């Protein structure tokens, strides 16, 4: 299976997970709080695919992204965010695809999206650092999902850009 086919299968699975937890998911078009401050870790294979998305952007959006890259700071907005929307949505990394879901990690801890603390996803089921519903039982960590690929090194987006 190639990477694009893998992403298509992953997206189908994630769609089912989002549907299963829909009463706890408050993601909406235009809500980009998850993209406005972070480190955005991604693997080499994800970066390569992301850049394919960049290459097909129109000239205006390419210039916007390039300007955003010049101004990128650690913990800042994703440079691919334009007008509160992902300019490379179909090419986004796995961390962006799974963000918003609460899932079980290999050490049996639950990964809860940070927006739960801000009154968004899972906010009604998340109190004092504890989640009161059953999380997705699959570990959705990038390294686990990409285990069948030679995915290369994982770095934060800013580190890939400054490399």
State what each model feature region is.
Residues 1-33, 37-163:
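Short loop/turn segments that flank or connect secondary-structure elements
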